[in-house]
């Protein structure tokens, strides 16, 4: 699971990352990455948005758990104080963990290439 220090819970920061961050989308999800000034005391944080359009509460929680597990593998590669928001789209409800992993990796490569390039 994703550690508590890496979880994003502040609504204002969610909105800022979605409005000002770099965006990449695939069929099952959209990723927003906001890279700010590196702060040594603040690690990269990851937040998730899974709306009712994805499915009922059981399905939404299942999708969130899968995404949290997948994001755990990538959080160490994010720059310090970066904010990553992963927004699940309705097809994520029927996607396998492998499909979600593939889409997340491709989105991260796209926003990462834009940030460093």
From Swiss-Prot:
One of its GO terms (molecular function) is tRNA binding. One of its GO terms (cellular component) is ribonuclease P complex. One of its GO terms (biological process) is tRNA 5'-leader removal. Consists of a catalytic RNA component (M1 or rnpB) and a protein subunit. It catalyses: Endonucleolytic cleavage of RNA, removing 5'-extranucleotides from tRNA precursor. Keywords: Endonuclease, Hydrolase, Nuclease, RNA-binding, tRNA processing. Pfam families: Ribonuclease_P (PF00825). It comes from Nocardioides sp. (strain ATCC BAA-499 / JS614). Belongs to the RnpA family. RNaseP catalyzes the removal of the 5'-leader sequence from pre-tRNA to produce the mature 5'-terminus. It can also cleave other RNA substrates such as 4.5S RNA. The protein component plays an auxiliary but essential role in vivo by binding to the 5'-leader sequence and broadening the substrate specificity of the ribozyme. InterPro entries: Ribosomal_Su5_D2-typ_SF, Ribsml_uS5_D2-typ_fold_subgr, RNase_P, RNase_P_CS. The keyword tRNA processing applies. HAMAP family: RNase_P. This is Ribonuclease P protein component. The keyword NAD does not apply. The lineage of its organism: Bacteria, Bacillati, Actinomycetota, Actinomycetes, Propionibacteriales. It comes from the Bacteria.
